Swiss-Prot record:
It comes from the Bacteria. Its EC number is 6.1.1.10. Belongs to the class-I aminoacyl-tRNA synthetase family. MetG type 1 subfamily. Zn(2+) binds at residues 146, 149, 159, 162. This is Methionine--tRNA ligase. Residues 583-685 form the tRNA-binding domain. A motif ('HIGH' region) lies at residues 15-25. Its cofactor is Zn(2+). The gene is metG. The keyword Cytoplasm applies. Is required not only for elongation of protein synthesis but also for the initiation of all mRNA translation through initiator tRNA(fMet) aminoacylation. Homodimer. Binds 1 zinc ion per subunit. Keywords: Aminoacyl-tRNA synthetase, ATP-binding, Cytoplasm, Ligase, Metal-binding, Nucleotide-binding, Protein biosynthesis, RNA-binding, tRNA-binding, Zinc.
Amino acid sequence: MSKANRQILVTCALPYANGPIHLGHMLEHIQADIWVRFQRMRGHEIYFVCADDAHGTPIMLKADQMGIAPEQLIADVQKSHYADFCGFNISFDNYHSTHSEENREFSEMIYNRLKENGFIKTRAISQLFDPEKSMFLPDRFVKGTCPKCKAEDQYGDNCEVCSATYSPTELIAPRSVVSGATPIIKESEHFFFDLPSFEAMLKQWNRSGALQSEVANKMQEWFDAGLQQWDISRDAPYFGFKIPGTENKYFYVWLDAPIGYMASFKNLCNRQNIDFDRFWNKDSQAELYHFIGKDIMYFHSLFWPAMLEGADLRKPSNIFVHGYVTVNGEKMSKSRGTFIQAATYLKHLDPECLRYYYAAKLSNRIDDLDLNLEDFVQRVNTDLVNKLVNLASRNAGFIQKRFAGKLADKLDDEALFNEFIAQSAQIAAYYENREFGKAVREIMALTDKANKYVDEKAPWVIAKEQGRETELQRVCSMGIQLFRVLMGYLKPVLPKLAERSEAFLQAELTWDNLTQPLLDHEIAPFKALFSRVDSKQIEAMIEASKAENAAVNSSPKAEKTAKKTTALESEFEPLEAEISIDDFAKMDLRVAKVISCEAVPESKKLLKFQLDLGFETRQVLSGIKAAYGNPEELMGRFVIMVANLAPRKMKFGMSEGMILSAGSGGEDLFLLDVDAGVKAGSRVK
């Protein structure tokens, strides 16, 4: 298929319908939207679809907690999600839901085809069951220690630390997220997709060279570990689609979620009379691309193409994987206000600022992207306001006042204009390969050249001298011509700024028409195209995020949910507010050796310690008497103490520090221990 005749379908991963969109989500959707808008500018037939992922136990349980039907919850969330995406100018052709008739039909069709082709197996499995809630526990409602890397607090289906996949019954020390109870094992008949049958096909797909190297390498690790049959069924109660021919079995959410790509596109096809089969038949020549995050690579690189192959449908042309978003070099934090919802951002800042910042830092690799808020302000103001928009404003005034808005009929510097046009192919290649950061750097280098041209020509000087009217018009027109080319190159990134620029230029910006300058052309009076970002806006957004997160935690819904807090969660004290590394560094924790320990007769709680710190001896009173009824046994052991705590005069003597212990109090207290070989006075780091 020639590039002039490309037919392309693009999807983003489906946001889960139980929470708001945040700036982490927006990275993927902005990345995909920039690529889609570029392809539209190139004249290709391209469709961009997405949907809410609306099935699964989490939605069922959250709706129950809220006292509403799951259908009402997902409808409300979908409306909110779509509003956020529209706010960031994400140009979906369709935004649907996996809880749709189209998705039900496709899910049943694919399942039936897989079954007819011999790729569905059934067998009884031992499954974790919550004895308190009388329900089988989905993978994501079991947590425990990863059986592979031993990372704690991992879900029942895969480890977020080492990316290993496993059965929930393999978890070490599993617990129910629903009730906190320790699950028991019960048998249930389940349906499995025979993934190992597709290993040869998947290996060939992996070796095709189309996939990102990081994806291909990760797939090879999974091949080396051995592919396993995939459990595609869940027991009732469950919110989703019932498996045909069963009474109480439902499709696992990860079976019908990617099928939602097809369902959303089918919904669009039905409304716009598009040929669906032309994009999804096995022999389709159309291009199909999925933009996803690195946390769901496994499903999209193994299960999804294998399901399509087994159902006699086409496979994706490629999956484009991105990393996570950090803020100021750290994971997004609710307490710090850096877990920023899309709706919160939109109340304080122009969405085009974030689109530009993300674009400036995006590559086609799976690298995490850091949203440094100080750099964000500086980059937006410098690049977009001081350089780009200023290029138009500093020339437009002369054109409007002195020449009635009419541009010159000849270029002042044809060679410079041609230099800008010559970069079109390179910039287009960067966009095509999703190297948006490189495209932006190339465009801003041209912007610097354009401003250098204006600075050297100094139209404000020419304007003061008689007889140089023609020169003034040509110089200022040249500045406008260069601005137009730059704005055309940035149109996929900044669609609204491009729209305002088109109104100012009174000409549409297309990739092809940029090669022809606007000679003897009338432009509109210049109006402000873009506003500077003030650091106070950032501060207000952060404070609003903190307040929103605090409100969620104290809302009636949260109180209702708190009443259902799991037994496991209620066993522990809540986390304190986050502190910085500098705050932590203020504490001087030291290893100390117990020289003597005795009960304080007049106190029911206190033991009196004499501690050797290596360089001095300290007396510490510690309220652990109930846990250590025979204090003499503590003599000679090592403990950890806070050594720089101000001495405190107590009723029974002076206490010169604090000994660290863990537990809920009373008899449930345990002194922290250290390995053999450590010396008294050693600092804990």
